[in-house]
From Swiss-Prot:
HAMAP family: DXP_synth (MF_00315)
SMART domains with a match to the protein in the record: Transket_pyr
Binding partners and assembly: Homodimer.
Family per similarity comment: Belongs to the transketolase family. DXPS subfamily.
Source taxonomy: Bacteria, Bacillati, Actinomycetota, Actinomycetes, Kitasatosporales
Pfam families in UniProt: DXP_synthase_N, Transket_pyr, Transketolase_C
PANTHER family per record: 1-D-DEOXYXYLULOSE 5-PHOSPHATE SYNTHASE-RELATED (PTHR43322), 1-DEOXY-D-XYLULOSE-5-PHOSPHATE SYNTHASE, CHLOROPLASTIC (PTHR43322:SF5)
Pathway: Metabolic intermediate biosynthesis; 1-deoxy-D-xylulose 5-phosphate biosynthesis; 1-deoxy-D-xylulose 5-phosphate from D-glyceraldehyde 3-phosphate and pyruvate: step 1/1
Organism: Streptomyces avermitilis (strain ATCC 31267 / DSM 46492 / JCM 5070 / NBRC 14893 / NCIMB 12804 / NRRL 8165 / MA-4680)
GO MF annotations, alphabetized: 1-deoxy-D-xylulose-5-phosphate synthase activity; magnesium ion binding; thiamine pyrophosphate binding
The name this protein goes by in its record: 1-deoxy-D-xylulose-5-phosphate synthase 1
Residues where Mg(2+) binds: D144, N174
GO BP: 1-deoxy-D-xylulose 5-phosphate biosynthetic process; isopentenyl diphosphate biosynthetic process, methylerythritol 4-phosphate pathway; terpenoid biosynthetic process; thiamine biosynthetic process
Amino acid sequence: MTMLENIRGPRDLKALSEAELGELAEEIREFLVHAVARTGGHLGPNLGVVELSVALHRAFESPVDRILWDTGHQSYVHKLLTGRQDFSKLRSKGGLSGYPSREESEHDVIENSHASTVLGWADGLAKARQVQGEKGHVVAVIGDGALTGGMAWEALNNIAAAKDRPLIIVVNDNERSYSPTIGGLANHLATLRTTDSYEKVLAWGKDVLLRTPVVGNTLYESLHGAKKGFKDAFAPQGMFEDLGLKYVGPIDGHDMKAMESAFRRAKRFHGPVLIHCLTEKGRGYEPALAHDEDRFHTVGVMDPLTCEPLAPSNGPSWTSVFGDEIVRIGEEREDVVAITAAMLHPVGLNKFAEKFPGRVWDVGIAEQHAAVSAAGLATGGLHPVVAVYATFLNRAFDQLLMDVALHRCGVTFVLDRAGVTGVDGASHNGMWDMSILQVVPGLRIAAPRDADQLRAQLREAVAVDDAPTLLRFPKESVGPAIPAVDHVGGMDVLHRFPESPQVLLVAVGVMAPVCLQAAELLEARGIGCTVVDPRWVKPVDPSLPGLAAEHRLVAVVEDNSRAAGVGAAVALALSDAEVDVPVRRFGIPEQFLAHAKRAEVLADIGLTPVEIAGRISAGLATKEELSKEKQE
């Protein structure tokens, strides 16, 4: 058996020698490269936290000590060390999640993979333990960009206010912009600054100086300033101590012995401690280290030797279509600028940034700031395009409502990964946007069905300068173009049964192919259908109620929550127009969806042509029976 195969839980790490730990780290990296290459996933971040994860589990007693991971995509090594080594179905249906999962293990605490939240969690858990007199440590691991999020600093401010509440923060600093201060001096200072004697000497010195008549206070302030200046010169993270946190580091994040020693000393300290570990994203895998873009942050199925993708390509992605079109628009209009929140490449703005470096801003993990800054840009005479993942726009709802919409700012939001994303699980599905945003006055929402519509609707959106607009599209490759056969108002008619159609299928965006297939199945049963793409789903097209009145049933199909979504808006529009036609809503139920392929998730929740056609057919049959009963 390999060294890794002998690790069934954290306790198995305790007896390993320094040489064996080094061997284990090499095995883990080799395992990760080959396992993640088979399934896809977050490779670079996990290659960077191998030694850090081992040191944590040697120094602490999980699950009694609670180890919390921010941006949980860096928890693969943690999974391996806590008895989860079957990565054969990582991020696949029935397999391990790509993030921590309480269902998988008692060692996992936070399932949410939205960044910058772990310090708030840690603050609450530490308070709960203090109030209830429970033993054990709370350890929060934050990094991979998560400290760019404002929530992290709000939490730090609160954590620092409790000088007597033990809490250990581990900063996994894998940013290449930091200058490493590694070696004997840093390790010596790390040892010194967490000892009780160091604290006692500081307290004694302060007391003596402040008691000295006339010059005592001035002398203390001068010496304190000198100490701070020296500290900041060698460790620029002195701002942490200015908050009131005990700062330790920087420490070599690949030196297990140094980290374990720092962790054990931190356990003895009686207040909040921040340990700064310098790690290398993609460590041990040359292709990742050579990849300047993001050090193989996320990879698809690939050959681990050549790094060539093995999954078949089904054509251009929605992201690439957007990325190319926004560049063309930027060439035509100098007032169009772009903003993203730590997602420049994933949302397709990298080409825009290369072409117009002075017209794009990556604000870090700060969606709220992105929205407000966009409002300022719009007020200043520009048209900002804010591109983020759909699930992350949830964070900026108040700013979109009160800063963008209230001020009627011409801002275009582009939501990538909208609807069911699949393998990344519950917190990455973009299934709430069309429900949450229904209440925003003046906002217009577009859901393009194909690449041609994405290009057209993006241009329509940036032409609006007195209200916010929004486009949404999924993660998958773009399918073939779906032509319109007719137009009603602003809607595209995709299919029309020639004689007295009974069912009006309202296809929201990428659900158009599903609706066309459902219509084909229904017509095989003698039920004629009309299929329309509303294009702009908010506000509801004023022509829709009149078209609905020509049918016996309206069915709205959307890859969004059924609660308060497009179907609910259509039902309200028909009610307001006094059109007495029932509306069936097909969408995502009110539940968090387990990770699986997008097609598997859609099948599980009934968003397939067969399921939709069957339920519509059954509903019409029931309606006919009820009508007959009334006549009798």
